[in-house]
Amino acid sequence: SARVQQAVHDAVRDLQGERSRSELSVPLVAQRAGVTPSTVYRRWGTLQELLADVARERMRPDDPPDDTGALETVLKAWARQYLEEISSSPGREYVRDLVASEGEENSEQCNRYCQVKIRAILDRAAARGEPHPDADTVTDRVTAPIVFRVFFSPGDPEPAWAEALVDQVLADL
């Protein structure tokens, strides 16, 4: 039920704030959520799949990005926010959980969530008559480099670097 899912997700998020990853277990999550471990296993199969499901839900877009004006301004603000979210400790953990999950559905869903936000920005630019790239171009040339840099390069990228990625995309229009 939706109530069980919410209770289990809340328990995972609470426990992630209190304990290290190695201390998490299905019985611990179940106890915190007020359900039996078999309920968790039946629904998610493994702790890793549960963690991936929580990560996917966290990445679900709540609202479209703020429309603060021109495409350049909005896309740069979104790129800075995306960089900040994904480079935070919880953001890194969520991405790791998604990548470690079996199958591709969680990763594909997160890509769709990201595309929804990007398309909202681009659709508003189109409505204003602004030239704009397509969502795949923004994903390939802004989102993907951010993810790569956060996970595979030393140090955290600066927000100005994320803005420069947007500048490069817009310069090619």
Name these PLM-found stretches.
Residues 112-115, 126-169:
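Hydrophobic/aromatic-rich alpha-helical bundle segments in the mid-to-C-terminal region
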Residues 1-32:
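Basic, helix-initiating cap at the start of DNA-binding domains
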Residues 84-85, 103-128, 140:
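Amphipathic alpha-helical packing segments from all-alpha helical-bundle domains
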Residues 26, 55-62:
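Short, basic, alpha-helical segments at the C-terminal edge of helix-turn-helix-like DNA-binding modules
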Residues 63-92, 139:
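Hydrophobic alpha-helical connector segments
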Residues 18-21, 41-51:
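HTH DNA-binding helix-turn interface
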